[in-house]
Amino acid sequence: MKNTLLTMVLFAAASAVCGQNHTVSASSDDTDGFPLVDHTTCPIMISKDDGKTVNKVAQLFAGDIERVTGRVPRVVTSTKPKCKYMVVIGTIQGNDYLKKLGEAGKIDVHAIDNAWERYVVKVVENPSKGVEKALVIAGSDRRGAAYGTFAVSEAIGVSPWYWWADVPVEKKEKLMLKADMISKSPSVKYRGIFINDEDWGLKPWASRNFEKELGDIGPRTYAKVCELILRLKGNMLAPAMHSCTGAFYTHDKSKLVADTFGIIITTSHCEPLLLNNASKLEWDQNKDGDWNYATNKDAIIAKWEKRLGEASCFENIYTTAMRGLHDAGLRGNMPMNERVPLIERVIADQRAMLQRHKDIPAEQIPQIFVPYKETMDIYENGLKVPDDITLVWVDDNYGYMKRVSNPEEQKRKGGSGVYYHLSYLGAPHDYLWLNTTAPVLMYEELKKAYDTGADKYWLLNVGDIKPMELGMTTFMDFAWDFDSFDTKTINTHQAKMLARIFGQKYHSDFQYLLDRHYQLAWSRKPEFMGWEREWDKPEYTGLKDTEYSFDNYNEAQQRLAGYKQISDLAADIATDLKEPLRASFFEMVEYPVKAEYQMNRKFLMAQLNHALQGKGDFAGANWAASQAKEAYDSIATLTKEYNSILNGKWDGMMKLAPGWCALYQKMPKVTVNPNTVEKPADLSCDNKKNWLDSCFVVDLRNYSKISNDAQQSIRLVDGIGYDWHVVQLG
């Protein structure tokens, strides 16, 4: 068996489009390919013994074929196929037909037997009597079968983001496939997302739009979430857990939905043993008492026992230890020498409960400990964490890893993992609005963790999922096959993704646009342009002028020009795209780029208003004020458009967060002088101001030679830093 990439050759039967000035035609001469759809559609055969996940995946695959061709294949459970061509989807343990193919040497099941989430995809000649060809998708387990199936879905043109980002599917009348592939095991065992801070996006969208009958994020929403995770080759979900949302387990069907898709449920660092204490439905202090293990242990244990009784029969990863309510510190004003033994006792009690409910040794149950905020202090003050529990290291909330495993920790049986943020709510400032974490930064920081053994558990905080499509895809691709990336390839990953969706002719435009998008946000995210801190002392709160200067080094002018350039580029591409692609492009590219330009324009023009007013240039000040107000209104217009596209499919998703945590969304104060005609200010760049006096700048990209030896290395890395090119040592 060749260990090659899956290759699919697609042909569209010749057809004429009546009433238009062109025809659509392509060769259909391939006689070697597997006819997934030709004059008829191939049935999809599964085994009734393979369980609900394989059945769900087969039904989704049938839906994918319908999206491409308009034809719906049958999903059957017959053990004696009576057709010339068929698709077989299943696991090698649960599908006797696949077992027999393996025994006959027609597929290499030994390569994936007893492996984690691997698959074989192969066109098999004469697999059984009366069958001429079969497209065989055999998984080592239920998720392996799913990943193999969705690899075929992507090859025929169905994006994992077909629903969540409205990526259109190109129609074909005929699908001829070639396939011969054995997958590797994923780089990271558990890979998934945490839906967080959903108050101003996913929750209002689900409650008032997608799941109105429930009025909450419930099983219908989670079905779409789980499907997306599976299509992105993930396997794990930490559900939404803010108090505005009904806790995951309060809607009985949600856990059944996750299990149907084969998705493992985990929880955040502050939800021990699957219990969401941020929700009053789970923990009500008026009824249940204080969330304090030292004083209210029995009530807390009773809650955990109840949760394990209803959930332990499913695949879960259990958060151990405990923090305070929601994201607060541990309750009780205890010194450190009392905190450490208390948390050790909590963990011991939790493991005893898990062992009793699961009826297997605690060492065999997936568990995590997250040293985050005050629990990091407790850990570093001597907390003894059982060796089989996975340590999950956390970034600093802004993309930089605070800690990775030391040599001793790397020897632990439980290994380590990562909890990483693309979205954050908290001090000193949130960034919930747009996706601005540079892919190279993500790669460099995750590589530090991966190289020190963090390959067990990767969880990504994605906020509301939208508009984090690009960053989420990059993270999941890392987790699936980290070694396929390096510092040279990572910065092109997202541009290539966009080019596959919207057209290769835009590839260089996408690369430039994304480079500038991330570079400009590197020095200041759009959410930080108000120059204030949140939840801080009064002197640090309230909108302020930025520190970008209009007088020195063209700082403000260049920033405005840079954002305007990519905003205009996004608009030009949108105009050039065919109509079916425009909604998806608006969601993933056009809205973020245009909105961040207007956010910068709003604050910088307000700042210019203040400066010109102080200089007595009242006409210029009035012009700057109107520019700031126009930018403010433009953000509202763009957001309204986001919520209106596709007949309001995403209505509520892009609601702006309220001022108590997002002052930057407000209009800064400006001064307007009555009876004074506006006069535009000159915002052109003066090249004489570009450089520091008496300084000489060397562009290291123009090097002629780099000398490295065994002890040290020097390399230039693109896609990171203020200049977007850095020298990396070591």
Located regions from the model:
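Bacterial Sec-dependent N-terminal signal peptides
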Residues: 1-26
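Contiguous, structured surface segment used for ligand recognition
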Residues: 20-185
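The substrate-binding groove and active-site-proximal loops of carbohydrate-active enzymes
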Residues: 47, 134-139, 196-219, 235-245, ...
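Gly/Pro-rich turn-and-neighbor structural signature
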Residues: 75-77, 168-176, 249-250, 257-260, ...
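An acidic-aromatic substrate-binding cleft motif
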Residues: 160-214, 220-240, 414-417
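C-terminal non-catalytic alpha-helical accessory regions
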Residues: 167-172, 494-662
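Catalytic domains of carbohydrate-active enzymes, especially glycoside hydrolases
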Residues: 214-243, 253, 257-266, 313, ...
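Extracytoplasmic
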Residues: 669-730
